[in-house]
Amino acid sequence: MQSTTNYLWHTDDLLGQGATASVYKARNKKSGEVVAVKVFNSASYRRPPEVQVREFEVLRRLNHQNIVKLFAVEETGGSRQKVLIMEYCSSGSLLSVLEDPENTFGLSEEEFLVVLRCVVAGMNHLRENGIVHRDIKPGNIMRLVGEEGQSIYKLSDFGAARKLDDDEKFVSVYGTEEYLHPDMYERAVLRKPQQKAFGVTVDLWSIGVTLYHAATGSLPFIPFGGPRRNKEIMYRITTEKPAGAISGTQKQENGPLEWSYSLPITCRLSMGLQNQLVPILANILEVEEDKCWGFDQFFAETSDILQRTVIHVFSLPQAVLHHVYIHAHNTIAIFLEAVYEQTNVTPKHQEYLFEGHPCVLEPSLSAQHIAHTAASSPLTLFSMSSDTPKGLAFRDPALDVPKFVPKVDLQADYSTAKGVLGAGYQALWLARVLLDGQALMLRGLHWVLEVLQDTCQQTLEVTRTALLYLSSSLGTERFSSGAGMPDVQERKEATELRTRLQTLSEILSKCSHNVTETQRSLSCLGEELLKNRDQIHEDNKSIQKIQCCLDKMHFIYKQFKKSRMRPGLSYNEEQIHKLDKVNFSHLAKRLLQVFQEECVQTYQVSLVTHGKRMRQVQRAQNHLHLIGHSVATCNSEARGAQESLNKIFDQLLLDRASEQGAEVSPQPMAPHPGPDPKDLVFHMQELCNDMKLLAFDLQDNNRLIERLHRVPSAPDV
């Protein structure tokens, strides 16, 4: 045990060890509060006195939630060594998070944004106090879990930190080589003499490497054999990197350098976030000082990301979930353009559903009027694009599975097991994403069908109403016989109008029949969707199988992790170790088999089926559009015919009225008795009123039809 005036600790409770100090978990003697104590070793005291006290001075200047707090500086009882009493972060570091096999291919989007927010806030506080850290890396970013279960990351280890204004330089070299700025790497690692001085932007390079590591699970610059074994090539990669590139690798000994301008396909960040992040990485991983961003621009661009809100959009034509990052004060027009950039669906062809209801987005309004979305509850984008659904693009985890060496090698076996387990967790993540994608496909199509069924029903009601009035009009006795129309021209016009109305009635009857057929077809498709939605619950068993394999593999992995530090195993322990390797390999094979044969194949079949259904829905929507146009045209023509009939009847009524008021000479005997004039006038007035009502109803129908069928036809391809 060791102690200071107020704290004590056991040397077995080691949290971390560096070149100049060790960190232990300690307790307050009075309260029992857990803290971290940093105890400096003899190497630390060989440094100049001003360097020894620098870390105390730096920490005393800082007070921020994203920087590890300094509680006190005390001395040990016997040797009177200086001890820093600091905040204890119980959940390890960002490095330990990234070392977890679950994060082999990088953090989830939610956790990455937490890291970005915390690191940016902590670095901003350093800059406000004129401090340069000089050793930013995942191992120096500590993690604790807040009361609500959220991660909080804090910058730590200020042994290399010092006060430095923006226009000042320093010449001493600190840092960890994989995260070092190339100029510092050249002098510190390659030991090449140079007279360069370094500024505050060296921290930006380290931040860039750290963020890339957090996003992908791997370092951005990797020579053949690794950074520690091939230092000259490591330096070449960082200094010869083309503008805009964010990573470089050498896959063969003495092979060419390969550059990438985007994050790898295994990265779990959405394309929406990647599009925002990649330009930042490209501009801070820049070796030339005049081309590299300064802190002001870095803070501005990262803050811009963190201030954005994410809107989840599931594109039915593509069968892909998109994350659209925009500011709440942006207009919806900007949101629609952002969707276009990711989906290639132009704003005028974008139609949205949210939770089963049509969602009309007014371009002039602000984006804060858009409903709150989540990955499980996105806006559903529906357009008449005829493209084949592409679905989620991913790399088969089986391609990243390393193989065990035949002999027993505890360190190599541990590393291999870790790699295999990482691929297994990637398969589990992908299986969940693929299953969620299938559910969103089925749910989105179900909602579209409901909207189309409503359109069918309303179109039928409008069409049948128009048919009812036309039938009533055509069945009028006076109109049918043409009685009271002595004028041949008037009789001819009325007959032609009657014929036209009969034709319109036949067209509307055909439209009604077509809508009914479409309705029946959509109902059949809806029944298929319900069956498939029930099947989704069955597919969830595949994920349970993968999880079961992973649980067993993780248990063996923990045994390997424990054994790797041992010098060797007894005979019996070695036999058990060999059996564990065999079982681990069998479990991995079973896991990947379930993923490929059940998850991936089911997803691919779902994509093909989804494409066929989308084309069927597209045909139905186009058909309804044409029917709606026909009904609207028929209503318009019927209105015109009724207006013409009204004019004929109005004129007839005027003529009859004038005949009744005039003195008329006796008429010769007609071969057949004519209708009573009073009776005729009464019927004409009645018919005229009916026709006017019909005209008004047809106008209302037309307006309703126009509202129902404002559906764009398929865009030109």
Curated annotation (Swiss-Prot):
GO terms for biological process: cellular response to virus; gene expression; immune response; interleukin-17-mediated signaling pathway; intrinsic apoptotic signaling pathway in response to DNA damage; mRNA stabilization; positive regulation of canonical NF-kappaB signal transduction; positive regulation of lipid storage. It comes from Mus musculus. InterPro entries: IKK, Kinase-like_dom_sf, Prot_kinase_dom, Protein_kinase_ATP_BS, TBK1_CCD1, TBK1_ULD. Residues 9-315 form the Protein kinase domain. PANTHER family: IKB KINASE, INHIBITOR OF NUCLEAR FACTOR KAPPA-B KINASE SUBUNIT EPSILON. Changing K38A: Dominant negative. The modification Phosphothreonine is found at T503. Expressed in bone marrow-derived macrophages and at low levels in liver and white adipose tissue (at protein level). Detected in muscle and lung. Residues 452-473 are annotated as: Leucine-zipper. It comes from the Eukaryota. Its EC number is 2.7.11.10. One of its GO terms (cellular component) is cytoplasm. ATP binds at L15, G16, Q17, G18, A19, T20, A21, S22, V23, K38. Sumoylation by TOPORS upon DNA damage is required for protection of cells against DNA damage-induced cell death. Desumoylated by SENP1. Serine/threonine kinase that plays an essential role in regulating inflammatory responses to viral infection, through the activation of the type I IFN, NF-kappa-B and STAT signaling. Also involved in TNFA and inflammatory cytokines, like Interleukin-1, signaling. Following activation of viral RNA sensors, such as RIG-I-like receptors, associates with DDX3X and phosphorylates interferon regulatory factors (IRFs), IRF3 and IRF7, as well as DDX3X. This is Inhibitor of nuclear factor kappa-B kinase subunit epsilon. Kinase activity is inhibited competitively by amlexanox. There is a cross-link at K231 (Glycyl lysine isopeptide (Lys-Gly) (interchain with G-Cter in SUMO1)). It catalyses: L-seryl-[I-kappa-B protein] + ATP = O-phospho-L-seryl-[I-kappa-B protein] + ADP + H(+). CDD domains: Ubl_IKKE (cd17128). Keywords: ATP-binding, Cytoplasm, DNA damage, Isopeptide bond, Kinase, Nucleotide-binding, Nucleus, Phosphoprotein, Serine/threonine-protein kinase, Transferase, Ubl conjugation. It is found in: Cytoplasm; Nucleus; Nucleus, PML body. GO terms for molecular function: ATP binding; identical protein binding; IkappaB kinase activity; K48-linked polyubiquitin modification-dependent protein binding; protein kinase activity; ubiquitin protein ligase binding. SMART domains: S_TKc.
